[in-house]
Amino acid sequence: MASGDGGDDAGVKRVADRYLKREVLGEGTYGVVFKAVDTKTGNTVAIKKIRLGKYKEGVNFTALREIKLLKELKDSNIIELIDAFPYKGNLHLVFEFMETDLEAVIRDRNIVLSPADTKSYIQMMLKGLAFCHKKWVLHRDMKPNNLLIGADGQLKLADFGLARIFGSPERNFTHQVFARWYRAPELLFGTKQYGSAVDIWAAGCIFAELLLRRPFLQGSSDIDQLGKIFAAFGTPKSSQWPDMVYLPDYVEYQFVSAPPLRSLFPMASDDALDLLSRMFTYDPKARITAQQALEHRYFLSVPAPTKPSQLPRPPPKGDSGNNKIPDLNLQDGPVVLSPPRKLRRVTAHEGMEVHMHRADRTEEHPSGARHMDDMSSQSSRIPMSVDVGAIFGTRPAPRPTLNSADKSRLKRKLDMDPEFGYTE
Protein backbone atom coordinates (compact mmCIF):
# COMPACT_ATOMS: atom_id res chain seq x y z
CA MET A 1 0.00 0.00 0.00
CA ALA A 2 1.20 3.47 -0.75
CA SER A 3 1.73 5.81 2.11
CA GLY A 4 0.27 8.96 0.60
CA ASP A 5 -3.18 10.29 1.32
CA GLY A 6 -3.55 12.39 -1.78
CA GLY A 7 -6.84 13.52 -3.24
CA ASP A 8 -8.26 12.60 -6.65
CA ASP A 9 -9.49 15.14 -9.21
CA ALA A 10 -12.78 15.55 -7.34
CA GLY A 11 -10.99 16.34 -4.10
CA VAL A 12 -12.04 13.08 -2.46
CA LYS A 13 -9.55 11.71 0.05
CA ARG A 14 -7.98 8.36 -0.66
CA VAL A 15 -7.13 5.79 1.97
CA ALA A 16 -4.04 3.73 1.14
CA ASP A 17 -4.44 4.65 -2.57
CA ARG A 18 -7.27 2.13 -2.97
CA TYR A 19 -10.33 3.46 -1.15
CA LEU A 20 -12.11 6.73 -1.90
CA LYS A 21 -13.36 8.09 1.39
CA ARG A 22 -16.98 9.24 1.60
CA GLU A 23 -19.21 10.31 4.51
CA VAL A 24 -18.85 9.26 8.13
CA LEU A 25 -21.36 6.58 9.17
CA GLY A 26 -20.70 6.56 12.91
CA GLU A 27 -18.21 7.25 15.68
CA GLY A 28 -17.32 5.37 18.85
CA THR A 29 -14.85 5.24 21.71
CA TYR A 30 -12.08 3.62 19.70
CA GLY A 31 -12.53 5.12 16.26
CA VAL A 32 -14.81 6.03 13.39
CA VAL A 33 -16.66 4.18 10.60
CA PHE A 34 -16.95 5.80 7.19
CA LYS A 35 -18.31 4.89 3.80
CA ALA A 36 -15.84 4.42 0.94
CA VAL A 37 -15.53 3.13 -2.61
CA ASP A 38 -13.08 0.35 -3.44
CA THR A 39 -11.39 1.57 -6.63
CA LYS A 40 -10.18 -1.95 -7.36
CA THR A 41 -13.66 -3.49 -7.52
CA GLY A 42 -15.97 -0.47 -7.70
CA ASN A 43 -17.89 -1.74 -4.68
CA THR A 44 -19.07 0.43 -1.82
CA VAL A 45 -17.49 -0.61 1.49
CA ALA A 46 -17.52 0.44 5.13
CA ILE A 47 -14.15 1.16 6.76
CA LYS A 48 -13.68 1.06 10.51
CA LYS A 49 -10.71 3.21 11.50
CA ILE A 50 -9.37 2.22 14.92
CA ARG A 51 -6.92 4.34 16.86
CA LEU A 52 -3.82 2.33 17.68
CA GLY A 53 -2.92 4.38 20.75
CA LYS A 54 0.54 5.11 22.07
CA TYR A 55 3.57 2.95 21.37
CA LYS A 56 3.54 1.27 24.80
CA GLU A 57 -0.15 0.43 24.53
CA GLY A 58 0.33 -1.59 21.36
CA VAL A 59 -2.38 -2.67 18.94
CA ASN A 60 -5.99 -2.71 20.11
CA PHE A 61 -6.56 -6.34 21.17
CA THR A 62 -10.28 -6.10 20.49
CA ALA A 63 -9.56 -5.26 16.86
CA LEU A 64 -7.10 -8.14 16.58
CA ARG A 65 -9.71 -10.55 17.90
CA GLU A 66 -12.25 -9.27 15.41
CA ILE A 67 -9.82 -9.69 12.51
CA LYS A 68 -8.77 -13.17 13.60
CA LEU A 69 -12.31 -14.43 14.09
CA LEU A 70 -13.86 -12.89 10.98
CA LYS A 71 -11.16 -14.45 8.82
CA GLU A 72 -12.42 -17.81 10.09
CA LEU A 73 -16.14 -17.02 9.95
CA LYS A 74 -17.21 -17.05 6.32
CA ASP A 75 -20.99 -17.35 6.09
CA SER A 76 -23.85 -15.62 4.27
CA ASN A 77 -25.26 -14.39 7.61
CA ILE A 78 -21.99 -13.00 9.00
CA ILE A 79 -20.46 -9.70 7.93
CA GLU A 80 -17.53 -10.10 5.53
CA LEU A 81 -14.15 -8.64 6.44
CA ILE A 82 -12.63 -7.69 3.08
CA ASP A 83 -9.32 -6.17 4.12
CA ALA A 84 -7.34 -5.04 7.16
CA PHE A 85 -4.27 -2.81 7.17
CA PRO A 86 -2.41 -0.22 9.29
CA TYR A 87 -2.31 3.26 7.84
CA LYS A 88 -1.13 6.58 9.28
CA GLY A 89 -1.08 5.34 12.86
CA ASN A 90 -4.52 3.73 12.67
CA LEU A 91 -5.79 0.25 11.98
CA HIS A 92 -8.34 0.06 9.16
CA LEU A 93 -10.85 -2.78 8.82
CA VAL A 94 -12.73 -2.92 5.51
CA PHE A 95 -16.18 -4.52 5.55
CA GLU A 96 -18.88 -5.04 2.98
CA PHE A 97 -21.29 -2.10 3.09
CA MET A 98 -24.69 -2.73 4.69
CA GLU A 99 -27.54 -0.28 4.17
CA THR A 100 -29.21 -0.46 7.56
CA ASP A 101 -29.64 -2.56 10.70
CA LEU A 102 -32.43 -4.36 12.52
CA GLU A 103 -32.81 -1.61 15.11
CA ALA A 104 -33.76 0.84 12.36
CA VAL A 105 -36.36 -1.63 11.08
CA ILE A 106 -37.85 -2.16 14.54
CA ARG A 107 -38.06 1.53 15.34
CA ASP A 108 -39.47 2.74 12.01
CA ARG A 109 -43.21 3.17 12.54
CA ASN A 110 -43.82 3.29 8.77
CA ILE A 111 -42.76 -0.35 8.51
CA VAL A 112 -45.40 -2.98 9.20
CA LEU A 113 -43.80 -6.34 9.96
CA SER A 114 -45.90 -9.38 9.13
CA PRO A 115 -45.43 -12.67 11.01
CA ALA A 116 -43.58 -13.96 7.93
CA ASP A 117 -41.20 -10.97 8.02
CA THR A 118 -40.40 -11.50 11.69
CA LYS A 119 -39.82 -15.19 11.05
CA SER A 120 -37.39 -14.38 8.25
CA TYR A 121 -35.29 -12.01 10.37
CA ILE A 122 -35.15 -14.48 13.27
CA GLN A 123 -34.21 -17.34 10.95
CA MET A 124 -31.29 -15.39 9.45
CA MET A 125 -30.11 -14.31 12.89
CA LEU A 126 -30.16 -17.90 14.17
CA LYS A 127 -28.37 -19.17 11.06
CA GLY A 128 -25.53 -16.74 11.73
CA LEU A 129 -25.41 -17.73 15.41
CA ALA A 130 -25.51 -21.45 14.61
CA PHE A 131 -22.49 -21.02 12.32
CA CYS A 132 -20.58 -19.11 15.00
CA HIS A 133 -21.34 -21.72 17.65
CA LYS A 134 -20.39 -24.54 15.28
CA LYS A 135 -17.00 -22.85 15.00
CA TRP A 136 -16.87 -22.48 18.82
CA VAL A 137 -17.23 -18.70 18.74
CA LEU A 138 -19.36 -16.69 21.19
CA HIS A 139 -20.58 -13.37 19.82
CA ARG A 140 -21.28 -11.80 23.26
CA ASP A 141 -22.73 -8.55 21.88
CA MET A 142 -25.99 -9.56 20.25
CA LYS A 143 -28.39 -6.62 19.88
CA PRO A 144 -30.46 -5.20 17.01
CA ASN A 145 -27.95 -2.57 15.88
CA ASN A 146 -25.28 -5.28 15.51
CA LEU A 147 -27.51 -7.15 13.06
CA LEU A 148 -26.87 -5.41 9.75
CA ILE A 149 -29.09 -5.61 6.67
CA GLY A 150 -27.80 -5.36 3.11
CA ALA A 151 -29.39 -4.08 -0.09
CA ASP A 152 -30.50 -7.64 -0.87
CA GLY A 153 -32.31 -7.92 2.47
CA GLN A 154 -29.82 -10.37 3.97
CA LEU A 155 -29.30 -9.98 7.72
CA LYS A 156 -25.74 -10.46 8.96
CA LEU A 157 -24.13 -10.61 12.39
CA ALA A 158 -21.56 -7.84 12.87
CA ASP A 159 -19.27 -6.30 15.50
CA PHE A 160 -17.23 -9.23 16.77
CA GLY A 161 -15.06 -7.06 19.02
CA LEU A 162 -16.25 -8.90 22.16
CA ALA A 163 -16.39 -12.35 20.54
CA ARG A 164 -14.32 -15.15 22.05
CA ILE A 165 -13.48 -18.78 21.41
CA PHE A 166 -15.21 -21.09 23.90
CA GLY A 167 -15.24 -24.77 24.70
CA SER A 168 -12.67 -25.27 27.46
CA PRO A 169 -14.64 -26.36 30.57
CA GLU A 170 -12.36 -24.54 33.02
CA ARG A 171 -11.98 -21.32 31.06
CA ASN A 172 -13.17 -18.11 32.72
CA PHE A 173 -14.64 -15.13 30.88
CA THR A 174 -15.78 -11.73 32.02
CA HIS A 175 -19.51 -11.46 32.71
CA GLN A 176 -19.52 -7.76 31.75
CA VAL A 177 -20.53 -8.37 28.14
CA PHE A 178 -23.67 -7.58 26.12
CA ALA A 179 -25.69 -4.43 26.59
CA ARG A 180 -27.64 -4.92 29.84
CA TRP A 181 -31.06 -5.41 28.23
CA TYR A 182 -29.74 -8.48 26.39
CA ARG A 183 -27.76 -10.12 29.21
CA ALA A 184 -28.71 -13.61 30.30
CA PRO A 185 -29.52 -14.09 34.00
CA GLU A 186 -26.39 -16.18 34.58
CA LEU A 187 -24.28 -13.19 33.47
CA LEU A 188 -26.22 -10.86 35.74
CA PHE A 189 -25.47 -13.25 38.60
CA GLY A 190 -21.75 -12.97 37.82
CA THR A 191 -20.87 -16.32 36.25
CA LYS A 192 -17.45 -16.47 34.61
CA GLN A 193 -17.95 -19.85 32.98
CA TYR A 194 -20.54 -19.86 30.22
CA GLY A 195 -21.16 -20.96 26.67
CA SER A 196 -23.38 -20.39 23.66
CA ALA A 197 -26.54 -20.14 25.80
CA VAL A 198 -25.75 -16.47 26.56
CA ASP A 199 -26.08 -15.66 22.85
CA ILE A 200 -29.39 -17.54 22.69
CA TRP A 201 -30.87 -15.50 25.55
CA ALA A 202 -29.90 -12.29 23.73
CA ALA A 203 -31.40 -13.66 20.52
CA GLY A 204 -34.62 -14.31 22.44
CA CYS A 205 -34.62 -10.66 23.57
CA ILE A 206 -34.25 -9.59 19.93
CA PHE A 207 -37.10 -11.94 18.91
CA ALA A 208 -39.27 -10.35 21.60
CA GLU A 209 -38.24 -6.88 20.43
CA LEU A 210 -39.37 -7.67 16.90
CA LEU A 211 -42.75 -8.83 18.19
CA LEU A 212 -43.27 -5.83 20.49
CA ARG A 213 -41.49 -3.18 18.40
CA ARG A 214 -39.68 -2.02 21.54
CA PRO A 215 -36.92 -3.40 23.76
CA PHE A 216 -38.42 -6.15 25.91
CA LEU A 217 -36.64 -5.94 29.29
CA GLN A 218 -35.29 -2.47 30.08
CA GLY A 219 -33.48 -2.66 33.41
CA SER A 220 -31.78 0.42 34.87
CA SER A 221 -29.14 -1.66 36.71
CA ASP A 222 -28.10 -5.30 36.85
CA ILE A 223 -30.31 -6.00 39.84
CA ASP A 224 -33.21 -4.14 38.22
CA GLN A 225 -32.63 -6.14 35.03
CA LEU A 226 -33.03 -9.37 36.99
CA GLY A 227 -36.22 -7.96 38.48
CA LYS A 228 -37.58 -7.29 34.99
CA ILE A 229 -36.69 -10.83 33.94
CA PHE A 230 -38.34 -12.40 36.99
CA ALA A 231 -41.45 -10.23 36.57
CA ALA A 232 -41.77 -11.55 33.00
CA PHE A 233 -40.94 -15.22 33.56
CA GLY A 234 -41.37 -15.74 37.29
CA THR A 235 -38.68 -16.14 39.93
CA PRO A 236 -36.68 -19.29 39.13
CA LYS A 237 -36.80 -22.19 41.57
CA SER A 238 -33.84 -24.40 42.37
CA SER A 239 -35.63 -27.23 40.58
CA GLN A 240 -35.61 -25.13 37.39
CA TRP A 241 -32.03 -23.93 37.73
CA PRO A 242 -30.03 -25.95 40.28
CA ASP A 243 -26.73 -24.05 39.81
CA MET A 244 -28.24 -20.60 40.32
CA VAL A 245 -27.60 -20.33 44.07
CA TYR A 246 -23.87 -21.06 43.58
CA LEU A 247 -23.24 -18.16 41.19
CA PRO A 248 -20.85 -15.44 42.49
CA ASP A 249 -23.34 -12.56 42.63
CA TYR A 250 -26.46 -14.53 43.41
CA VAL A 251 -29.20 -12.44 45.02
CA GLU A 252 -32.35 -13.96 46.48
CA TYR A 253 -35.56 -12.46 45.12
CA GLN A 254 -39.00 -12.78 46.64
CA PHE A 255 -40.90 -15.41 44.67
CA VAL A 256 -43.13 -14.10 41.89
CA SER A 257 -45.18 -16.43 39.72
CA ALA A 258 -44.84 -16.17 35.95
CA PRO A 259 -47.64 -14.49 34.01
CA PRO A 260 -48.89 -16.30 30.89
CA LEU A 261 -46.47 -15.73 28.03
CA ARG A 262 -49.48 -14.95 25.86
CA SER A 263 -50.18 -11.87 28.01
CA LEU A 264 -46.73 -10.49 27.11
CA PHE A 265 -46.95 -11.28 23.40
CA PRO A 266 -50.66 -11.22 22.50
CA MET A 267 -50.07 -11.19 18.73
CA ALA A 268 -47.56 -14.07 18.58
CA SER A 269 -48.46 -17.53 17.32
CA ASP A 270 -48.40 -20.57 19.58
CA ASP A 271 -45.28 -21.82 17.80
CA ALA A 272 -43.53 -18.48 18.28
CA LEU A 273 -44.38 -18.51 21.99
CA ASP A 274 -43.05 -22.04 22.37
CA LEU A 275 -39.75 -21.10 20.72
CA LEU A 276 -39.49 -17.98 22.87
CA SER A 277 -40.05 -19.99 26.05
CA ARG A 278 -37.20 -22.33 25.07
CA MET A 279 -34.87 -19.42 24.31
CA PHE A 280 -35.74 -17.88 27.70
CA THR A 281 -35.17 -21.07 29.70
CA TYR A 282 -33.43 -20.10 32.94
CA ASP A 283 -30.98 -23.00 33.16
CA PRO A 284 -28.39 -22.37 30.43
CA LYS A 285 -27.74 -26.12 30.22
CA ALA A 286 -31.37 -26.67 29.23
CA ARG A 287 -31.72 -23.62 26.96
CA ILE A 288 -32.33 -24.41 23.31
CA THR A 289 -29.33 -24.17 20.94
CA ALA A 290 -29.27 -22.13 17.74
CA GLN A 291 -29.35 -25.26 15.57
CA GLN A 292 -32.23 -26.75 17.57
CA ALA A 293 -34.09 -23.45 17.26
CA LEU A 294 -33.72 -23.55 13.46
CA GLU A 295 -35.32 -27.01 13.50
CA HIS A 296 -38.23 -25.83 15.67
CA ARG A 297 -41.74 -26.16 14.23
CA TYR A 298 -42.05 -22.35 14.21
CA PHE A 299 -39.98 -22.24 11.02
CA LEU A 300 -41.90 -25.12 9.43
CA SER A 301 -45.38 -23.75 10.05
CA VAL A 302 -47.40 -21.32 7.93
CA PRO A 303 -46.58 -18.62 6.98
CA ALA A 304 -43.21 -19.39 5.44
CA PRO A 305 -40.43 -16.87 6.11
CA THR A 306 -40.43 -13.90 3.74
CA LYS A 307 -37.67 -13.97 1.13
CA PRO A 308 -34.91 -11.54 2.17
CA SER A 309 -35.25 -9.49 -1.01
CA GLN A 310 -38.94 -8.88 -0.21
CA LEU A 311 -38.48 -7.73 3.39
CA PRO A 312 -39.43 -4.13 4.25
CA ARG A 313 -36.55 -1.77 4.91
CA PRO A 314 -36.27 1.77 6.24
CA PRO A 315 -35.78 4.69 3.82
CA PRO A 316 -32.25 5.98 3.21
CA LYS A 317 -30.62 7.92 6.03
CA GLY A 318 -31.93 11.44 6.41
CA ASP A 319 -35.40 10.65 5.04
CA SER A 320 -36.90 8.87 8.04
CA GLY A 321 -37.85 12.01 9.99
CA ASN A 322 -39.23 11.19 13.42
CA ASN A 323 -40.54 7.76 12.50
CA LYS A 324 -38.99 5.98 15.46
CA ILE A 325 -40.99 4.04 17.99
CA PRO A 326 -39.98 5.16 21.48
CA ASP A 327 -38.45 2.66 23.87
CA LEU A 328 -41.06 1.77 26.47
CA ASN A 329 -40.97 -0.37 29.55
CA LEU A 330 -44.33 -1.91 30.35
CA GLN A 331 -43.23 -4.03 33.30
CA ASP A 332 -42.76 -3.36 36.97
CA GLY A 333 -39.30 -4.05 38.30
CA PRO A 334 -38.05 -4.43 41.85
CA VAL A 335 -37.54 -1.57 44.24
CA VAL A 336 -33.77 -1.12 43.94
CA LEU A 337 -32.22 -0.22 47.27
CA SER A 338 -28.50 -0.75 46.68
CA PRO A 339 -26.01 -2.25 44.24
CA PRO A 340 -25.98 -6.08 44.05
CA ARG A 341 -24.35 -7.80 47.00
CA LYS A 342 -24.35 -11.38 48.20
CA LEU A 343 -26.80 -12.75 50.76
CA ARG A 344 -29.60 -10.29 50.13
CA ARG A 345 -33.27 -10.58 49.43
CA VAL A 346 -35.07 -8.25 47.03
CA THR A 347 -38.78 -7.92 46.39
CA ALA A 348 -39.90 -7.85 42.80
CA HIS A 349 -42.69 -5.30 43.00
CA GLU A 350 -43.32 -1.83 44.30
CA GLY A 351 -44.74 -1.43 47.78
CA MET A 352 -43.38 -4.68 49.22
CA GLU A 353 -40.96 -4.82 52.11
CA VAL A 354 -37.36 -5.50 51.16
CA HIS A 355 -35.21 -7.62 53.49
CA MET A 356 -31.56 -6.68 53.20
CA HIS A 357 -28.41 -8.11 54.72
CA ARG A 358 -25.26 -6.01 54.95
CA ALA A 359 -26.81 -3.10 53.09
CA ASP A 360 -25.73 0.31 54.29
CA ARG A 361 -27.61 2.78 52.13
CA THR A 362 -30.60 2.99 49.87
CA GLU A 363 -31.24 4.38 46.44
CA GLU A 364 -34.58 4.40 44.70
CA HIS A 365 -35.11 3.94 40.99
CA PRO A 366 -38.36 4.51 39.14
CA SER A 367 -40.29 1.53 37.91
CA GLY A 368 -41.39 1.25 34.29
CA ALA A 369 -44.89 1.87 33.00
CA ARG A 370 -47.51 -0.84 33.58
CA HIS A 371 -49.13 -3.14 31.04
CA MET A 372 -52.50 -2.02 29.77
CA ASP A 373 -55.06 -4.37 31.29
CA ASP A 374 -57.10 -4.72 28.16
CA MET A 375 -54.25 -5.46 25.76
CA SER A 376 -54.96 -9.18 25.48
CA SER A 377 -58.64 -8.59 24.83
CA GLN A 378 -57.73 -6.33 21.93
CA SER A 379 -55.20 -8.71 20.40
CA SER A 380 -57.53 -9.77 17.62
CA ARG A 381 -57.78 -6.16 16.43
CA ILE A 382 -54.09 -5.21 16.77
CA PRO A 383 -51.77 -5.64 13.76
CA MET A 384 -48.48 -7.51 14.10
CA SER A 385 -46.59 -4.20 14.24
CA VAL A 386 -47.91 -2.06 17.08
CA ASP A 387 -47.41 1.70 17.17
CA VAL A 388 -46.76 1.66 20.89
CA GLY A 389 -45.52 5.23 20.80
CA ALA A 390 -48.94 6.44 19.73
CA ILE A 391 -50.65 4.20 22.30
CA PHE A 392 -48.64 5.16 25.35
CA GLY A 393 -47.01 8.49 24.47
CA THR A 394 -43.98 7.82 26.64
CA ARG A 395 -40.54 9.38 26.31
CA PRO A 396 -37.93 6.94 24.98
CA ALA A 397 -35.50 5.41 27.46
CA PRO A 398 -31.81 5.57 26.55
CA ARG A 399 -30.50 2.36 25.00
CA PRO A 400 -27.72 0.95 27.21
CA THR A 401 -24.20 0.24 26.10
CA LEU A 402 -21.17 -1.01 27.97
CA ASN A 403 -20.48 1.67 30.56
CA SER A 404 -17.07 3.14 31.37
CA ALA A 405 -16.53 0.73 34.26
CA ASP A 406 -17.30 -2.22 31.99
CA LYS A 407 -14.95 -0.88 29.32
CA SER A 408 -12.15 -0.27 31.82
CA ARG A 409 -12.56 -3.79 33.15
CA LEU A 410 -12.47 -5.23 29.64
CA LYS A 411 -9.43 -3.15 28.71
CA ARG A 412 -7.53 -4.36 31.79
CA LYS A 413 -8.40 -7.96 30.98
CA LEU A 414 -7.40 -7.55 27.34
CA ASP A 415 -4.09 -5.92 28.24
CA MET A 416 -3.27 -8.83 30.54
CA ASP A 417 -4.11 -11.49 27.94
CA PRO A 418 -1.03 -11.99 25.74
CA GLU A 419 -2.68 -14.67 23.61
CA PHE A 420 -5.70 -12.49 22.79
CA GLY A 421 -8.01 -15.33 23.75
CA TYR A 422 -7.71 -17.13 20.40
CA THR A 423 -6.38 -20.43 21.71
CA GLU A 424 -7.54 -22.67 24.50
Curated annotation (Swiss-Prot):
Source organism of this protein record: Oryza sativa subsp. japonica
Designated name of the protein: Cyclin-dependent kinase D-1
Keyword ATP-binding: yes
Induction context: By gibberellic acid (GA3) and submergence in the meristematic zone of internodes. Down-regulated by auxin.
Disordered: annotated segments: 303-337, 359-424
Pfam (any one): Pkinase
GO MF entries: ATP binding; cyclin-dependent protein serine/threonine kinase activity; protein serine kinase activity; RNA polymerase II CTD heptapeptide repeat kinase activity
Gene: CDKD-1
Subunit description: Interacts with CYCH1-1.
Entry binding sites for ATP: 25-33, 48
Active site residues according to the UniProt entry: 141 (proton acceptor)
EC number: 2.7.11.22, 2.7.11.23
One term under GO cellular component: nucleus
Composition bias, Basic and acidic residues: 359-374
Record PANTHER family: CELL DIVISION PROTEIN KINASE, CYCLIN-DEPENDENT KINASE 7
Positions of modified residues (Phosphothreonine): 29, 174
Domain Protein kinase: 19-299
Tissues and organs where the protein is expressed, per its UniProt entry: Expressed in actively dividing cells of roots, leaves and shoots. Expressed in the intercalary meristem and the elongation zone of internodes.
Modified residues (Phosphotyrosine): 30
Subcellular location(s) per record: Nucleus
